UniProtKB/Swiss-Prot annotation:
Assembly and binders: Microtubule inner protein component of sperm flagellar doublet microtubules.
Annotated spans, Disordered: 207-226
Note: 'Shippo' is a Japanese word for tail.
Coiled-coil zones: none
Pfam families in the record: SHIPPO-rpt (PF07004)
Full protein name: Ciliary microtubule associated protein 1A
InterPro entries hit by this protein: CIMAP (IPR051291), SHIPPO-rpt (IPR010736)
Localization, UniProt: Cytoplasm; Cytoplasm, Cytoskeleton, Flagellum axoneme
Keyword Zinc-finger attributed: no
Sequence ranges of the STPGR repeats: 180-205, 216-241
Length: 254
């Protein structure tokens, strides 16, 4: 074996671990489920009752009432506080002084016109601004309807005539060379009013259907390689070496 030529970097050596393909039965990878305990127990056996041990419960405190932090007022009863009237002393309120008119604010000499008869008095004031911004339309703001023409309103209108320009057709200045000639009119087809003659169309030559696929020629065949009708020597083919660790494929043909 030392004289053989090795291909690649692989060299024969002992396996570093167990190869599972070498074992014909389930190896240590498949463990039988245990019959004791609670986790992963075998389903084929009856399971006995399991008990668990727990620590001792904590003892409650002897005094469960609130401590001295909560001092209940002895004057508070179930109906409320049992207290006498209590008063508090506050400062004086600030009173707001009202401004009243004094003796100099009155004019008794002007009260004679309210008690005795007095002559009428007039006052001259400036002109008001309401006349300047008056939006009432003036005489020139109205547009009276027309009394002449065909569009009168509330009046009977007379007949109106319009004068039109002279027509260029048939006048002395009409150019007769621009009139259409006999060739400008389309002649009516006779077959529209008369019997229509039969019409024929000539089509291209019709080829019969055939096979246009490419066929092999004489040079495409190799009669010397035919071994079905002639005896030939046995032929051997080289295959690959199958591994001893590969499971063969078994197909159920039934």
């Amino acid at each position: 074996m030392a004289e053989e030529v090795w291909v690649g970097t692989w060299r024969p050596h002992r396996p570093r671990g167990p190869i599972m393909a070498l074992y014909s039965s389930p190896g240590p990878k498949y463990l039988i489920p245990p019959t004791t305990g609670f986790v992963k127990q075998t389903p084929t056996k009856l399971r006995a009752p399991a008990y668990s041990f727990r620590g001792a419960p904590m003892l409650l405190a002897e005094n469960c009432s609130p401590g001295p932090r909560y001092s209940v007022n002895p004057k508070i009863l179930r109906t409320g506080k049992d207290l006498g009237p209590a008063y508090s002393i506050l400062g004086r309120y600030h009173t707001k002084t009202t401004l009243t008119p004094g003796p100099g604010d009155y004019f008794p000499e002007k009260s004679t016109k309210h008690v005795f008869d007095s002559a009428p008095s007039h006052s001259i004031s400036a002109r008001t601004k309401t006349f300047r911004v008056d939006s009432t339309p003036g005489p020139a703001a109205y547009m009276l309807p027309m009394v002449m023409g065909p569009h009168t309103i509330g009046k009977v209108s007379q007949p109106s005539f319009s004068i039109k320009g002279r027509s260029k057709l048939g006048s002395f200045s009409d150019d007769l060379h621009k009139t259409p000639g006999p060739a400008a009119y389309r002649q009516t087809d006779v077959q529209v009013t008369k019997f229509k003659a039969p019409q024929y169309t000539m089509a291209a030559r019709v080829e019969p259907p055939g096979d246009k696929t490419l066929k092999p020629g004489p040079g495409a065949h190799s009669p010397e390689k035919v071994t079905m009708t002639r005896p030939c020597a046995p032929v051997v083919s080289f295959g690959i070496k199958h591994s001893d660790y590969m499971t063969p494929l078994v197909v159920d043909v039934d």
